[in-house]
Amino acid sequence: MVGARAGRVPAAAAAAAAVLIVAACVFSSLAGAAAAAEVVGGAAQGNTERISGSAGDVLEDNPVGRLKVFVYDLPSKYNKRIVAKDPRCLNHMFAAEIFMHRFLLSSAVRTLNPEQADWFYAPVYTTCDLTHAGLPLPFKSPRMMRSAIQFLSRKWPFWNRTDGADHFFVVPHDFGACFHYQEEKAIERGILPLLRRATLVQTFGQKNHVCLKEGSITIPPYAPPQKMQAHLIPPDTPRSIFVYFRGLFYDNGNDPEGGYYARGARASLWENFKNNPLFDISTEHPATYYEDMQRSVFCLCPLGWAPWSPRLVEAVVFGCIPVIIADDIVLPFADAIPWDEIGVFVDEEDVPRLDSILTSIPIDDILRKQRLLANPSMKQAMLFPQPAQPRDAFHQILNGLARKLPHPDSVYLKPGEKHLNWTAGPVADLKPWK
């Protein structure tokens, strides 16, 4: 971790270092903004750097021809009808489950012959039951998922051949298929037992956590490409903000003391740096939020209730170096995106020294991170555009699935063999879903 190596820097020296970094970053703003313009609708130019080694090759892989996916035609109550009832689902950070379904329906990897399929996909929208405030209610999600699996296992023979081992589901909620927004409750619930053998495509990723199943594919949350395009600023705009963050520091409704929410990391950010002139941090979310990220050198990406957030996507797209404060986080497409090279990792316990850590990074290292971030392929991999584009997040998911092939013989059940307990889990999850 970067934070483990930096000592405390006097305030005057830190400020001077920040000024030098901001000045040095002015020339590289052109590359980052221009690359963002290409990704969301313009033409790129400027100073970029290709990802070296195998990661760069993986990022640019083409999954077409490497796998075939059969898309289950589930009743609309599991997907399309839910969106029709509440279209807000199309714009929230969990919308990857909707757009992945739409993408696969017209994708070249789709097969209409299930006997030819390498993978089976069940489109179940588990995060589209929203409150009046637009927040998802995951408490019915286990019943909904269970109902969908019961339906497809009765109508088609393919689930029963493997107990779901050649199936994948998109579960983009805070803690994935644990289906709860609070970590303690998510751990208590655990992953839905019926998904024990399936591959989970989820935004949540944390090492050695009960809500991250081995073999899962960690993806970025949804951030609307069209909205970001509408807020692009001139590519020669200087990066005059050293550190930027907008968001909650305390969740007073659920955690008034600030010790549990974000494991206290956000509270520590506020208490230590609310008056630091190098830090532009606030709970207010201005209309110029996207523009401000494009004017910033570092964008803070601390954990909240879960370790991930759309800030990570926004930072990469806008060329702002992500400062990742979430211990043991598993980042999206980590086999394709060199997060150590483009970001800065800070241990949660080192947040009080964040000013020293960031001002101690050599300018040459910062400029290289910016050149890597300016690579259009890097940005494209974080987005779910409509229509899909080469090397985008849809294609990175397919690449991840393709790399799991061929399935070992052990996934196919022998006569009489079963792995799943259909009555396991909390009693409330066994109630019928309507």
Curated annotation (Swiss-Prot):
GO terms for molecular function: glycosyltransferase activity. Glycans are attached at residues 160, 421. GO terms for biological process: cell wall organization; glucuronoxylan biosynthetic process; plant-type secondary cell wall biogenesis; protein glycosylation. It comes from Oryza sativa subsp. japonica (Rice). It is an enzyme of class 2 (transferase). One of its GO terms (cellular component) is Golgi membrane. Its EC number is 2.4.-.-. InterPro entries: Exostosin, Exostosin_GT47. The chain crosses the membrane at residues 11-31. This is Probable glucuronosyltransferase Os02g0520750. It is found in: Golgi apparatus membrane. Residues 32-434 are lumenal. It is a single-pass type II membrane protein. Involved in the synthesis of glucuronoxylan hemicellulose in secondary cell walls. Keywords: Cell wall biogenesis/degradation, Glycoprotein, Glycosyltransferase, Golgi apparatus, Membrane, Signal-anchor, Transferase, Transmembrane, Transmembrane helix.
